[in-house]
Amino acid sequence: MTIDAALADKIRRTPKAELHVHIEGTLEPERIFRLAQRNNVKLAYPDVEALRAAYAFTDLQSFLDIYYAGASVLLTEEDFFDMTMDYVKRAAADNVRHAEIFFDPQTHTARGVPMGTVIDGIADALAQARTEYDFSSSMILCFLRHLSEEDALATLEAALPYRDRFVGVGLDSSERGNPPEKFARVFARAKELGLHLVAHAGEEGPPQYVTDALDILKVERIDHGVRAIEDEALVQRLARERVALTVCPLSNQKLMVHPDLRDHPMKRLLDAGVAVTLHSDDPAYFGGYMNANWEASFDALPLDAADAHKLARNSFEAAFLPDVQKAEFLAEVDHFWSATPASPPATANVTTTT
C-alpha cells in the first residue's frame, strides 16, 4: 500500500509529542566515531560503514549488545550535550514540539561516569533547545531491568540531588525473564517522591507484563505494549482507563516483534479505543526518526486523516505536561487539522502490490 501524497505531507507537518525515545539510541554512527576520536576510545569497527552494517539485529538482546557498545564513547558532559542536540535538531525538523526523553544512567555510572555528568549534559542541551528551537522537553530516568532492583534503588538515590531535572522513572532493557514485579520497591519509592511512572511491557514479554506494570508498578503509561492485542480484556481495560501505549513501529519491525508492518496491531488497538501514540524508540539504530515511523505506519496500514489527528492528539494528552501547556498544544493540533483540507481516507487512495 502507498500513502496518499496529501496525507503524507500532513503527517510530516502535524505537531507531535515524542514520548518514547532513548537518548543513547539517537547516537548516529558518525557521532559515535567523532566521540571515540575525541575521547580516545577504541571501537570494534574500522569505520562508520562497518558499524552501520552491524545494525542487523535479530531480537532485542542482539540490539542491546551493540547499543551498550555504542554508549561507551559517552564520557563527558560535552558528549551528552552534543548527542542530545543532535537529536533535538532531527526531532524539531519532524515537527516534534515536545519530547520526554529516556536516559539510562546505569549504562554510564557502571563505566565510572558520574551521575551529574550524564544528567547535566542532557539537561543543559534541552535548556538550550527550548530557546533555540522552541522545543519543550523533560527527562525520564530509566532503570535497566536486566540488573538488580538493589542497583535500581541505588541509582534512584544517587539521582536525587538532580531531582529537579527529571520528571519520572521508567523501566527498559531486556524484558525476557525480568518481569515488572522485580522492581516493585523502586517504583513504590519513586511514587513516594512524586515522580511519574512508565515501563516497557508487552514488547517481547507477554500481555501479563502489561497488566503487572499497571497493577504492581502503578505506571501511568505503557511503553510498547503491542502484545496487549492478545488479551481482549486487557485491550478493553486500556481503552476504558485511557492508558497510553507508546508504540514504536520501526523498532518492532527491526527487532522482529512484527517483521511485516502490515501485521502490526496499532490500527486495531486504535480502533478499539486505546490511546495509541507513535514514536521512534532508538532511531539511530532502527533507521527512522518520528516522521519515518509515521510514514511507515501509514504506508503499511489503512490509517487515514482522522487517525493521524487522533495519534497526534493522543501524544500530547499522554504527555506529562502542565494542564495549560497541554491545552495549548492540543489546540495547536486541532487547529492544524481543521485549518488544512483533510485528505481522503488512506484506504481510498492506496495501491496494493502482492
From Swiss-Prot:
The domain of life is Bacteria
- Keyword terms: Hydrolase, Metal-binding, Nucleotide metabolism, Zinc
**In its UniProt record, which GO terms are filed under biological process?**
adenine catabolic process; hypoxanthine salvage; nucleotide metabolic process
Which positions does the site annotation Important for catalytic activity cover?
A: H224
Q: Which GO terms describe its molecular function?
A: adenine deaminase activity; zinc ion binding
The active-site annotation reads: E203
Kindly give the PANTHER family that the UniProt entry links to this protein: ADENINE DEAMINASE
User: How is this protein named in the record?
Assistant: Adenine deaminase
